[in-house]
């Protein structure tokens, strides 16, 4: 796609699942990819896999809930690869529980990862983008943040916050050459979803959910990188502040 070759991109949560698929695709498009994740073994593997294909990638270990750790990781990536042109905020975590069965410690962990984490990364990276007059951001939220999701009250609140954050920053930063958009995945075959659907009862729920999806399947990580690449490309230069659902038709809006 136009405008991706030789750009630098930072992908949080890029060691596994959707993030790894995004990292691979953007490397194929000619980007220099920085993978920011806590899983060092998987992150090194993805970076090595990309490099083995003749593309450019590096792994940078950081906990996105730690502002200083994020700042150091971004500094390390930029020192080696140049200023960040693109940011994909993808990292996230959840565990399915009804809200009344949860406690404040659980809320804090979910909020730290799914809301404060992207806030930390965005605050560090967007300063440079605004100063340079160019930047593109794709935030990976969730349809849980648009329409709610039983068993994911706090996670849904965080993802709704990311949607609102994206729209607000799109307004604040458009004059500085920075555009931001949100992708909201529906149910996707990742470690998080599989943890929700364990056991016989989980299998029953999974089959019912698939029947509710017009395409009759869960998403897979490879369903998202093409849209991410488009939103970062020059072909999407007039698109900002938008929220796009990718759910096989489970949720429709517009």
Which residues fall in each region the model found?
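Active-site loop immediately N-terminal to the catalytic Tyr-X3-Lys motif
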Residues: 100, 147-153, 175-176, 216, ...
């Amino acid at each position: 796609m136009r405008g991706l070759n030789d750009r630098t991109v930072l992908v949080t949560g890029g060691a596994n699942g959707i993030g790894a698929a995004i990292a691979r695709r953007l490397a194929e498009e000619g980007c220099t990819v920085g993978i920011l994740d806590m899983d060092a073994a998987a992150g090194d593997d993805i970076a090595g896999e990309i490099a083995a294909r003749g593309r450019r990638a590096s792994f940078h270990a950081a906990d996105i809930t730690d502002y200083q750790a994020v700042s150091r990781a971004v500094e390390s990536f930029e020192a080696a690869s140049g200023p960040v042109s693109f940011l994909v905020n993808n990292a996230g975590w959840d565990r399915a529980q009804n809200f009344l069965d949860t406690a404040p410690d659980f809320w804090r962990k979910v909020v730290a990862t799914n809301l404060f984490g992207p806030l930390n990364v965005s605050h560090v990276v967007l300063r440079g983008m605004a100063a340079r007059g160019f930047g593109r951001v794709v935030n990976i939220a969730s349809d849980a943040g648009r329409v709610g999701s039983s068993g994911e009250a706090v996670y849904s609140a965080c993802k709704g916050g990311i949607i609102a954050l994206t729209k607000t920053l799109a307004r604040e930063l458009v004059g500085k050459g920075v555009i931001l958009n949100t992708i909201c995945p529906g149910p996707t075959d990742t470690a998080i979803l599989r943890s929700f659907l364990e056991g016989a009862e989980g299998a029953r729920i999974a089959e019912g959910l698939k029947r509710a999806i017009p395409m009759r399947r869960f998403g897979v990580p490879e369903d998202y990188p093409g849209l991410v690449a488009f939103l970062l490309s020059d072909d999407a230069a007039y698109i900002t502040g938008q929220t796009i659902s990718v759910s096989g038709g489970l949720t429709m809006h517009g």
